[in-house]
Amino acid sequence: MATAVNGAPRDAALWSSHEQMLAQPLKDSDAEVYDIIKKESNRQRVGLELIASENFASRAVLEALGSCLNNKYSEGYPGQRYYGGTEHIDELETLCQKRALQAYGLDPQCWGVNVQPYSGSPANFAVYTALVEPHGRIMGLDLPDGGHLTHGFMTDKKKISATSIFFESMAYKVNPDTGYIDYDRLEENARLFHPKLIIAGTSCYSRNLDYGRLRKIADENGAYLMADMAHISGLVVAGVVPSPFEHCHVVTTTTHKTLRGCRAGMIFYRRGVRSVDPKTGKEILYNLESLINSAVFPGLQGGPHNHAIAGVAVALKQAMTPEFKEYQRQVVANCRALSAALVELGYKIVTGGSDNHLILVDLRSKGTDGGRAEKVLEACSIACNKNTCPGDKSALRPSGLRLGTPALTSRGLLEKDFQKVAHFIHRGIELTVQIQDDTGPRATLKEFKEKLAGDEKHQRAVRALRQEVESFAALFPLPGLPGF
């Protein structure tokens, strides 16, 4: 018999069913979503993940991400919240900030950090909002040359990124012959453009950045220097690549690439004395902290994702261990081994090699392109992504493949294993060229994919390579939650 609650009948059976729904495991509650997750888990387990921006988070990070912290709203900052019941959230966020500064060896008197950005793109936009007035000028590495979409990318016909819509953007470039950043040309253009902010950051650039040179250019133009170290943040922790903190005013990062945490972002900013007035001797302080914090909240975000902040805190603790530092050294060693093996197989690597976790393979000499190779390799259980190479005429048919080693290094692959991976890639690209020869030089990507999917001869070759790849990948355990 139903009882009345606030004048409305309550169905006891229905309410009991509601309580059961809240307690059901995902497998029973939503079989469709569970099945999709299981399929994706299997894809990751049997495939070779070579996308440079991906990694496998640890079990501890994923447990924090799936915790009760997801339930709590906490707009504001520690000690200054707009909600009650946030004492433990304050404790967590303060711990995450402390670990972030410790991980990168930063003095809390000289640096602060905001750990609330939802990811790297919001972190970057918050910095622009804080430091550059609307339609103010910024300079970042051009997307086709290895930069990132959020660094102000636009084409001749359209402003693509919101950064280029709300701010005036001028890209700097690499030398098309060497693939290295053309710092001389950047310096000349900065004198003409007078940027308020220069961005030192990349998404597909295999060499270390010259932060000292970039800071000199920034100082000559009265500009801030911001590093976007999203791709290399784990390498920076381990000290295997140069740190941006010595020269930059602001440093942003994601937390899920080489840092191997969950998906989130951080903004580091200088605090304390910026300069001393030569006439009065008065100290001039940085005001970045208040500007950046207010840009993140309430400027661009609402309540922080506390479960993600917990995952970041866990990842930062792991990043300060000797094991993590050894892992990062192996990431770089594996990347160099992969590069050397591909060169031996006759491939051109943009810049001739790598200082970090990724390489860009130029396929023009092989007579094919990144889009077609990506599709064939994907069919063979090898995940990577197409990418423009210096000198490409069109972003619609990029010549390169971006390959990274962080994810497979997390699974335990070493240099000798990456030599085998290089041979798998080589066989996939040879198959790409064969399919392209069958479709003709004027065939579209759509026609190429139809040939790949519909031709039994090519499908047999794909199946044979995929079976070898999956048998090899299954030898290496997949980090993360058991069952997924």
UniProtKB/Swiss-Prot annotation:
Source organism superkingdom:
Eukaryota
Annotated keywords: Acetylation, Cytoplasm, Isopeptide bond, One-carbon metabolism, Pyridoxal phosphate, Transferase
For the modification N6-(pyridoxal phosphate)lysine, which residues carry it? 257
Q: What is its main location?
A: cytoplasm
What Gene Ontology terms describe where this protein resides (cellular component)? cytosol; mitochondrion; nucleoplasm
Q: Which residues carry this modification: Deamidated asparagine?
A: 6
This protein's cofactor list reads:
pyridoxal 5'-phosphate
Compartments, record wording = Cytoplasm
- Provide the E.C. number(s) assigned to this enzyme: 2.1.2.1
A GO molecular function annotation here is: pyridoxal phosphate binding
Report the catalytic activity.
(6R)-5,10-methylene-5,6,7,8-tetrahydrofolate + glycine + H2O = (6S)-5,6,7,8-tetrahydrofolate + L-serine
Q: Which SUPFAM superfamilies match?
A: PLP-dependent transferases
Q: Where is this cross-link: Isoaspartyl glycine isopeptide (Asn-Gly)?
A: 6-7
The record's annotation in InterPro entries points to: PyrdxlP-dep_Trfase, PyrdxlP-dep_Trfase_major, PyrdxlP-dep_Trfase_small, Ser_HO-MeTrfase, Ser_HO-MeTrfase-like, Ser_HO-MeTrfase_PLP_BS, SHMT-like_dom
PTM summary: Deamidation of asparagine produces alternatively aspartate or isoaspartate, which in turn can be converted to aspartate through carboxylmethylation/demethylation.
Positions bearing N-acetylalanine: 2
**Active-site residues (renumbered):** 204 (nucleophile), 256 (proton donor)
In the UniProt record, does the keyword Ribosomal protein occur?
no
Pathway noted in the entry? One-carbon metabolism; tetrahydrofolate interconversion
Family recorded in the similarity comment = Belongs to the SHMT family.
Record function comment: Interconversion of serine and glycine.
* Record text on subunit structure and interactions: Homotetramer. Identified in complex with ABRAXAS2 and the other subunits of the BRISC complex, at least composed of ABRAXAS2, BRCC3/BRCC36, BABAM2 and BABAM1/NBA1.
A further note on this protein reads:
In eukaryotes there are two forms of the enzymes: a cytosolic one and a mitochondrial one.
Q: Return the protein name.
A: Serine hydroxymethyltransferase, cytosolic
Q: Which organism is it from?
A: Oryctolagus cuniculus (Rabbit)
